[in-house]
């Protein structure tokens, strides 16, 4: 199993993404899925604003009451801190849920994240970061 497992809404169903290890340089290096519901695709480089939290997550696409509560925590935190990326996180922002631990991990030891997409290139995002 790889970590994180990223879940989010899809077209009519939810999607689950596995981040492949660095040893796989090309899609052709990956094993061919044996289940027709599984597809392999390359996802372009992207920038996300990340909110990390611990606890138990629901099943499915991760967009449940826990994720919604954590989204509001992230929105309040970003709003109170201001900063260069506050315009990208709001109460209606879309997000992905990243889970890092196996199901048997105790909830208080689990690492979860909400990933809010930021429509900037990595270079543009880096330029917006505050300097020390």
Region roles according to the model:
Residues 1-132:
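A solvent-exposed interaction/effector surface
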């Amino acid at each position: 199993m790889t970590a994180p497992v990223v879940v989010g809404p899809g077209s009519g169903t939810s999607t689950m993404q596995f981040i492949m290890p660095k040893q796989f340089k090309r899609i052709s290096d990956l094993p061919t899925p044996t289940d027709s519901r599984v597809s392999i695709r390359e996802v372009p480089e992207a920038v996300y604003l990340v909110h990390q939290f611990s606890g138990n997550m629901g099943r499915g696409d991760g967009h449940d009451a826990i994720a919604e509560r954590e989204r509001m925590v992230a929105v309040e935190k970003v709003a109170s801190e201001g900063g260069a990326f506050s315009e990208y996180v709001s109460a209606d922002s879309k997000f992905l849920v990243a889970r890092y631990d196996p199901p048997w991990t105790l909830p208080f030891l689990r690492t979860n994240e909400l990933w809010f997409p930021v429509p900037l290139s990595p270079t543009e995002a880096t330029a917006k970061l505050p300097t020390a």
